[in-house]
């Protein structure tokens, strides 16, 4: 134990000297090392099918260490969102949120397109033949359905792990609701985005009208897309800020999305997940409120051993991917 204490003190002194330097003799930094080697074990997750995720409408694989790949998996139906999908997405992302081995997620569509949106044939009975004896009861029934469908994409936004949408082909209707709940969006050159709901006689009600204005920051463009249901092609999506990168085809895009997820997963999970929480809070609150929130947040997060490990790697010119961070 004495040897361990001495080693910790030596590391603290080393970091303090490296960080402060001779130009700032009055600056002192207090760093603590906690935990044991048992807390720092590398993840033993095998690549391939994720055993805890078995679904009808989704396929979940361990694409790389700490990275899960979620595919919308109804290619013969253009990945249309049926009743099973709405339930399984909630189950899937609730599991991912609790998965200490997962640090980043990529979501894509199998087959020729990302998604055709809501499967109207499968869901017609819920929408066109709602249950209830009178207007009040029918209204409460429909409201319950709408809020449950909203939860399908809320769980993506709430997931503490960054979620990267990789879009090819059509991203129609509910697909726009889905990707606007993600943290990062990539697309292939053949992608297009379409707020389709107005063409089927309703207002989008599971996230697009609430999130898209904040994603692209252009209310006039949002109004145009929502009122007309016109297609937004890949280059326009890039110019508007809906996506951050466009790639020649699906294969190149998926490789890039998985590489990005791997890079994110190499960082401190405490830092990454804290960053996501604070970015979402800041989106919906004032600067003053958000600064106060992050101050309260970091009063505990600054005590993480991830800080010490990251600083040590930096001072020793090591890449962060060589650092083993504890599970979170």
Curated annotation (Swiss-Prot):
Substrate binds at residues 116-120, 174. Pathway: Lipid metabolism; fatty acid beta-oxidation. GO terms for molecular function: delta(3,5)-delta(2,4)-dienoyl-CoA isomerase activity. GO terms for biological process: fatty acid beta-oxidation. It is found in: Mitochondrion; Peroxisome. CDD domains: crotonase-like. The keyword Isomerase applies. Signal peptide: none annotated. It catalyses: (3E,5Z)-octadienoyl-CoA = (2E,4E)-octadienoyl-CoA; (3E,5Z,8Z,11Z,14Z)-eicosapentaenoyl-CoA = (2E,4E,8Z,11Z,14Z)-eicosapentaenoyl-CoA. Residues 1-33 form a transit peptide. Isomerization of 3-trans,5-cis-dienoyl-CoA to 2-trans,4-trans-dienoyl-CoA. NCBIfam families: PRK06142.1. PANTHER family: DELTA(3,5)-DELTA(2,4)-DIENOYL-COA ISOMERASE, MITOCHONDRIAL, ENOYL-COA HYDRATASE. Belongs to the enoyl-CoA hydratase/isomerase family. This is Delta(3,5)-Delta(2,4)-dienoyl-CoA isomerase, mitochondrial. It comes from Homo sapiens. The gene is ECH1.
